[in-house]
From Swiss-Prot:
InterPro entries with a match to the protein in the record: DUF2929
Subcellular location per the Swiss-Prot or TrEMBL entry: Cell membrane
Annotated transmembrane regions: 4-24, 34-54
GO CC term (a single one): plasma membrane
Record carries keyword Nucleotide-binding: no
Principal subcellular localization: membrane
Membrane topology, record value: Multi-pass membrane protein
Record protein name field: Uncharacterized membrane protein YjzD
Phylogenetic classification of the source organism: Bacteria, Bacillati, Bacillota, Bacilli, Bacillales
Amino acid sequence: MRYIIAFIWTFLLSHMACYLVASMNSVTYNFKTSSVIAVVLYVLIMVLAEIMPMNKNASQH
């Protein structure tokens, strides 16, 4: 479930960022390019999440 939610958020946020950048540069918004960027970002986030070490010793305050 976390993979699906992560993909949805990555998809939405990357599309909003691409729309904003395209709007600021006075160029047309391209859905296909934004989708490719979203998939690449999703893969990078998932790879980094698996590579990064988890803190197994949770401190209790």
